[in-house]
Amino acid sequence: MKFKIFLAIFAMIFFTSCSSDKENSSNENTDNASLSQSENTDFTLKFLDGRKMYVKYHEQEFNFDDTAKAKLFVFFTSWCEPCKAEIPHLNNLNKKYQDRFEVIALFLEENKEQEILTFIEDEKMKFPVAIGENNFVFSKVLNISSIPTMVLFNAKGEKVKEYLGLIPEEMLDIDIQKAIM
């Protein structure tokens, strides 16, 4: 009986989300730690492939320079096991809806680019990855306090849904279908 209780507690902790302690220590290094959802800010997400995405946040509305697709922003770290477990599902969804939707991963770590590239290769990530201090800015604007956290936006930049912890692929699929309509 004790083993079953232990197993249930362990599973609940594992599948809910990772602690944000490591994230918070990294966030202390940014100049934008005081941002909140009430402030206006503009910033640029920088991707490993050289692409950039301009994000404007004014009066609690988001504007992305790329309005062709709905977006699922995935905030994660390399040490978070639930984050790693989601990657195959996110690859599937990114491929399934590639014409109208994209997954965008945001590393909340200050790793060297080569470490991130190795992680991407090891975990077989097949969607864009943003790196840099503006990932922390975006996480502060969205009030991200744990990982994994995913935030779904439609193509107009309207926030559709926020997810905490490990989310079933089927649930994401249904919400993505609504966001791309």
Regions found by a protein language model. Give the residues of each.
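Loop/turn elements at helix/coil->beta-strand transitions in domains of secreted/extracellular proteins
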Residues: 68-70, 99-102, 126-128, 155
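A short beta-strand-turn-helix
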Residues: 44-71
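Hydrophobic beta-strand anchors of alpha/beta hydrolase catalytic cores
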Residues: 72-73, 103, 150
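Short, thiol/selenol-centered motifs that function as redox-active sites or metal-ligating centers
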Residues: 80-84
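Short pre-active-site segment immediately N-terminal to redox-active cysteine/selenocysteine motifs
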Residues: 69-71, 76-79, 146
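N-terminal targeting signals for export/organelle localization
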Residues: 1-53, 181
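Thiol/disulfide oxidoreductase modules built on the thioredoxin-like
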Residues: 122-126, 133-177
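Structural microenvironment flanking redox-active thiols in thiol-disulfide oxidoreductases
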Residues: 85-123, 134-139
